[in-house]
Design a protein with these regions (language model features):
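A conserved mid-protein helix/loop that constitutes part of the nucleotide-sugar donor-binding site
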Residues: 16-24, 205, 209-228, 245-252
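Short His-centered aromatic/hydrophobic patch
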Residues: 91, 108-114, 130
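A short, active-site helix/loop in glycosyltransferases that binds the activated sugar's phosphate group
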Residues: 116-118, 154-178, 185
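Short hydrophobic beta-strand element within catalytic cores of glycosyltransferases
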Residues: 304-307
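Conserved acidic donor-binding segment of nucleotide-sugar-dependent glycosyltransferases
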Residues: 318-330, 338-343
Length: 380
């Protein structure tokens, strides 16, 4: 049986939740039925090596820019550079046909920052992923309200949370080809890696936050909340796992707030799961997101979640395994305070998270996406 060739198009392989979801998705796809690769628009992302080390082909147009003394290759590179530059001037039209070694069956536009035409390849089906909530994220809102002419050309549009699915359909008016598929989770891998040892103090309750150190993730307000709670005599520690543009600013803020002794910045960790496993609960303080993969990973480990993102509640199912607060400092602070001071309430959510952990079965979750890909190949 011929394998279905799927190319996922990414802007850059950075350390983020969407990229982790893509990594898990490709690793979980049935290798007997699918052959997956990633085309990156911008090279040298910090996670390129992670993908390639896992045997996932990473392709880009930059090979033709490498210096060479071979005159034949140099001429070929010059021609390719010219055609690549022309494709970029046309908003990516024809770029994949130049750069991909083989004709794809399905092209998946996996990132909101892609060039408009890059995913459309003659003879291939096209899928668009919506990771953010257009109801709260201005980038996805603009796309849903102003890019319908491009969006209509996709064979399928996939939203990764019900909140995003509802908002996108309402704002874009595109209901027929829009589907809801949660990001699959490599749950066995998460549970296995969570058992590795990490050096963390255990004298006080530990709160964990994981994500890209960027403004939209709300780590600044989380540090302020941590200070407020300490001032109220609620002793605890905070560990923040991740890297990003605010890597220097956030530790400086911690020093200014005089909380440097109770906050740990681990930097980027290829394996964040032991930090989550050792924590009393996970906090997701983002201003806007789709359905954070890290929240599902925490529940997979039986760790309750406190979040300002409404779509996180979708991961709870029918269990009381976390707390969704209003998207404000005051509300998030009250939620964290309750988790730290109300033992009965916390015990209820901890039990619910442990019950919910069995829901996150990667093989079951990826089957929906495999079925979608196969159904696309049956359409004309």
């Amino acid at each position: 049986m011929r394998k279905i060739k799927v190319v996922f198009v990414e802007y850059q392989l950075v350390c983020g939740g969407a990229e982790q979801a893509l990594f898990d998705l490709i690793r979980l796809l049935d290798k007997e039925r699918f052959e997956a690769s990633v085309f990156v628009q911008t090279p040298d992302g910090p996670w390129e090596a992670k993908f390639m080390d896992a045997g996932i082909p990473v392709i880009h147009d930059y090979d033709c820019r490498k210096p060479t003394f071979n005159p034949v290759r140099k001429l070929g590179n010059f021609v390719k550079k010219c055609t690549v530059a022309q494709a970029h001037r046309r908003e990516g039209r024809g770029l994949l046909e130049i750069c991909l070694p083989e004709q794809p069956d399905i092209v998946v536009s996996y990132n909101a920052w892609m060039e408009r035409e890059i995913a459309f390849v003659r003879g291939a089906k096209c899928v668009k992923y919506i990771h953010g909530d257009p109801g709260t994220n201005p980038v996805y809102r603009k796309e849903a309200t102003q890019e319908q002419d491009v969006l209509r050309r996709y064979d399928r549009i996939v939203c990764v949370s019900r909140a995003a699915w509802n908002a996108f359909r309402e704002l874009s008016g595109l209901t027929q080809q829009t589907e809801l598929h949660y990001n699959p989770l490599n749950s066995d891998n998460v549970r296995s890696l969570s058992g590795q040892p990490v050096a963390l103090p255990d004298d006080l309750p530990l709160i964990c936050a994981v994500g890209r150190l960027a403004e939209e993730k709300g780590f600044e307000r989380l540090l302020v909340i941590h200070r407020h709670l300490l001032d109220q005599g609620i002793r605890h520690r905070l560990v923040i796992v991740g890297d990003g543009p605010d890597r220097d600013f956030l530790p400086r803020l911690a020093n200014a707030l005089d909380i440097q002794d109770s906050v740990t910045f681990t930097g980027y960790q290829a394996n964040p799961y032991p930090y989550m496993k050792r924590s009393k609960f996970l906090v997701n303080s983002s201003f806007t997101e789709g359905l954070p993969v890290i929240a599902m990973e925490a529940l997979c480990l039986g760790i309750p979640v406190v979040s300002t993102v409404p779509s996180v509640g979708e991961a709870f199912g029918e269990e009381d395994c976390g707390l969704i607060t209003d998207n404000s400092v005051t509300a998030l602070e009250e939620g964290i305070r309750k988790m730290l001071t109300d033992d009965t309430f916390y015990a209820k959510l901890k039990a619910g998270a442990e019950n919910r952990s069995v829901f996150f079965d990667g093989k079951r979750m990826v089957k929906e996406i495999e079925d979608m890909f196969e159904s696309l190949m049956k359409t004309t």
